[in-house]
Every structure is written in C-alpha cells, then in structure tokens.
Amino acid sequence: MPDHTPPPSGLDGAGLLVVDKAGGVTSHDVVSACRKALRTRRVGHAGTLDPMATGVLVLGVERATKILGLLSLTTKEYTATIRLGAATTTDDAEGDVVSRGDVSGVPDSAIDDGVAALTGDIEQVPSSVSAIKIDGRRAHALVREGETVVIPPRPVTVSRFEVLQRRRSADAIDLDVHVECSSGTYVRALARDLGAALDTGGHLTALRRTRVGPFTLEHARTLDELRADPRVSLDIDAAVATAFPRRDVSAAEAESLSQGRWLDPVGIPGVYAAVGPDGRTVALVQERGKRAGSVMVVRPATLGP
C-alpha cells in the first residue's frame, strides 16, 4: 500500500542524521537512501567518506542542511588496518599491487619509530586517488585515466597514531591502528608513508571512522535501522546543542534575532547558539565588533510556532 504521509514542513523532521556507513557504498548512495527513507530531497552531507570505508557520516535534513557549513568538524578519529609488505596504486586494498617488500627483518622498534615520525604536525602528500581537484578535475579521475598525478604536500596534524595490535605472516605485517587527526588528513597516506619509510610498501586494508567533530558512532545508525525507523539522529535543537556553544537570550532578544536584528556581544568566540526562554534555538550567532549578528536564523519570525 502506498505511503500517503505528507513530507515534513517547517522544522518538522529537521536535524542531523549520523549514519554508520557500510563498506562498498558511496556517500552519494547514502544521501540517496536517506532522501528515500525520509521522503525529502533536502538532505546533504558534511563531507564524504571513501566507498571502502565504514563509519560516521554526518548529514543535514530539511532546514538543518543550512548548518552543515557552520559545523566545526576539524578533528576526526579512525580505526584502521595497515598492511606492510606491498604498495598499491590506490594506497588501499582496492588498487593493484605496484611493489612488494620483505617484512621479515622489520623489528617492532622500527615500526614504532616510523609511526612516531608520522605523528604531530607533519607535511603530508594526499593520496593520488583523493577528491582533490587539479586544474579543475578530481585527482582520482585523472589516475583512472592513466595520468600521473602530483599533489603538493600540505600541513596536517596527527594528534594520535597508535598501534593497537600487530600480526605477522611470511609476507606481511598487519597493524591495527587508532588515528586522531585534523580534517584533510589521509589515513591511506599514513599507510603509504609508513611503508615507504620501512622500505616494505604499505596500504590500508580496512578503515572505519569513529568520530567527526562531536559526532560519534554512539549517535549513528545504519541505513537498515533508518529504513525501519525513519527519523533524524538529532533534531535541530539537539544538533545545535551538541555542536555549538550556548548563549541564553531573553524573549525580547529572541524576537529580535528571529526578525534578523542583532544583539550586543558578550564575548563568546566563534559561532554559537542563541537559545530562548523556551529552550529552543532561535539563531546561530557570531560576534563581529560591537554586534552579535545571526549567521543562520533557525526559527525566523515568518516560520511560525
């Protein structure tokens, strides 16, 4: 029987959806599935995740799509498995092997030294199969067409790179690792560079993102769980409370913000949530000079109750 339930309007259904992405599907596939499950076209993602990777993918639904660009998602955490003993064209298991190295003489101490050298503030050359654009085209598309891609190094911060477990075989060493890093860091490039430093070659065989900014696997649901219970993970007020500092405002101040007017600043840095006496977010606000103005009005006066 067809579903004749009307799609959400206003702030109904608005919020953030934190998906635990399965392997083998693209971020665009996830967006499409969420649009179908939630019966709305207004779904967007706050950054992608490689098809082979699993884990946290943050999406905005309905009016919450407007806050995606304001989210501070500058730190990320991953668990991964690095295989030493072979380098591949894609720096992961989906690529062709381009070289192999002998791992029999590699001591644990050398691995530890290599990991330490890739921890902290480093210059990293992104993977050649990344989504970075070169002369207007994605690097991964150029690589698939057989072109040689040279991407300049860029500064990243790897605040944690820890080996959790090691497994040795005749032709490989598998390392289960935990990585905490800045946005723009490529874990597959860490695998590549560790293998290069040890002269063994290295690539990823598994990657799972466990956190993006304040959003973790505890917030996340699989697509099957979403289909069974189609709702956002965090409504717009809960999403804002999780992601932004809070400023409580009076009813009069809330009305001013809802009408696009500014308030006096109170010295809160960055973007923060202005919350009215009813506990609902009125606007996301940023202070500039002598004004605290809205960067997004969550509940404009025209929206109604």
Named regions from a protein language model:
Residues 121-126, 153, 188, 200-206:
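Short, structured loop/turn "capping" segments at alpha-beta junctions
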Residues 88, 120, 165-170, 212, ...:
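Short, conserved beta-turn/loop elements at beta-strand boundaries and strand-helix junctions
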Residues 1-45, 49, 53, 115, ...:
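Accessory RNA 3′-end/elbow-binding domains used by RNA modification enzymes
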Residues 42-72, 128, 141, 145:
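Glycine/acidic-rich beta-strand-loop module
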Residues 36-38, 58, 149-191, 196-199:
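The conserved catalytic core of RNA pseudouridine synthases
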Residues 130, 134-153:
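Extended alpha-helical targeting/anchoring segments
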Residues 59, 80, 136, 190, ...:
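Residue-level signal for inorganic ion chemistry
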Residues 64, 69-126:
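Acidic, low-complexity central loop/insert segments
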